[in-house]
């Protein structure tokens, strides 16, 4: 593993989002390989109906690649500035955390690379606090207009359902973890999909994300037809526009709102 000089990173803000590809054009005058995403585990304690990998998750992880190989290949990417860590649920397996997640986080920290982790934030709080200093963005999905929605959609792809009490405990833990981590300075970005399930509850969802969970950013992404989300209904273009107008009219103006993959504009 190459020893890299530790760089001082500027805080994530609406004026500094290193995951935006256009900044590569500004810096290098061309698109370049600047972001790598690692799937560190195929395990998860939930099975969300909207999850792109929810139907492919496993009950046992294969052996990971040796970290020496990963370090060597990362060293070959001179313009690497961001890293995304996802799963499954990256904080579910203690073995994976020790063998893969923490080594990746420490590598990124030493090299001055920004790190985003995709998590459901439902696991014991000490796991998140243990890695907090290495995380630039904690990304979560929050599409829950009601507790029933969390209990059904959040476990929609799970064959053997846990008891309702256990599901609701995870919901409370997610809210508490988000609030605590936000209070301690972690940048949490909560993503909400626009579909028929979230449409009636957009105001409630936004207020919960901003006021209860104290997230730094609320991402809005339209849901498009996909095999993995076939149980969820998409919005018409008219409904989508109305939903966006509703969010813009009632949003907390001190909170960063990020709208992505809108069908109204070309990518």
List PLM regions with ranges.
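Radical SAM enzyme [4Fe-4S]-AdoMet core and its adjacent flexible, acidic
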Residues: 1, 6-12, 60, 75, ...
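Aromatic/hydrophobic pocket-lining residues that form the small-molecule binding cavity
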Residues: 66-70, 97, 101, 128, ...
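Conserved alpha-helical substructure of the radical SAM core
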Residues: 2-117, 122-127
